[in-house]
Design a protein with these regions (language model features):
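Signature for phosphate-centric chemistry
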Residues: 1-99, 103-191
């Protein structure tokens, strides 16, 4: 719709390139507080196709895939630091009761993939299905965050709860439990 509204004859490649450029500019306007309707320029199926292509790019660049685990592997040092910090807290050796780290989507996506959190880790050879199972806007919306909260019982047992974007998420692939013993979580994360 957008390209035909210009009124010029464009090759398929020119039309695709122009659509991408306009999409990349316009999609960011609402995040800047500008009230804007992308539907004015693109049909919903066109918008979905453009987003799915962008989503696939994020998936291939920042998550484990059947092509490479390298995007997730870059987060190994961060995960090891999270584990050692949690170990110190569990053993009562941490000076702080809260540890905060700040990063961007480009930091969180690899970490979440490495941790195999549900919805953040998806392997397939059918890349046209990625947008059905791995959605960047669910994984790292604006102000995305991962919480790892440790609890210690009166008997000294330590449990952990993970929350992604303020929602409790199970860590273990075969369980819906959102609070699990730290030792179980630790062993799983070190696999």
């Amino acid at each position: 719709r957008f390209v035909s509204a210009i009124g010029e004859e464009l090759s398929h490649g020119e039309a695709a390139a122009l659509s991408w450029e306009v999409y990349f500019v316009l999609r960011g306007l609402p995040a800047m507080g500008m009230d804007f309707d992308l539907g004015k320029y693109f049909k919903s199926d066109e918008l979905n196709a453009l987003w799915a292509c962008e989503d696939l790019g994020h998936y291939l660049k920042r998550s484990a895939s059947t092509l490479s685990t390298e995007p997730a592997d870059v987060a190994v040092a961060l995960l090891q630091d999270l584990i050692s910090t949690a170990d110190a807290a569990a053993e009562g050796k941490a000076d702080a009761t809260v540890q905060l780290r700040f990063g961007h989507a480009e930091t969180l996506m690899p970490l979440l993939s490495l941790m195999h959190l549900r919805g953040c880790y998806y392997l397939t050879n059918y890349f046209d299905t990625v947008a059905l199972h791995w959605r960047d806007f669910d994984i790292v919306p604006m102000a995305a965050n991962l919480q790892m909260v440790l609890f210690k019982t009166a008997k000294g047992r330590v449990y952990v709860r993970f929350a992604l974007n303020e929602r409790a998420v199970p860590l273990m692939p075969d369980s819906d439990d959102t609070v699990i013993p730290w030792s179980v979580a630790r062993n799983y994360l070190l696999r």
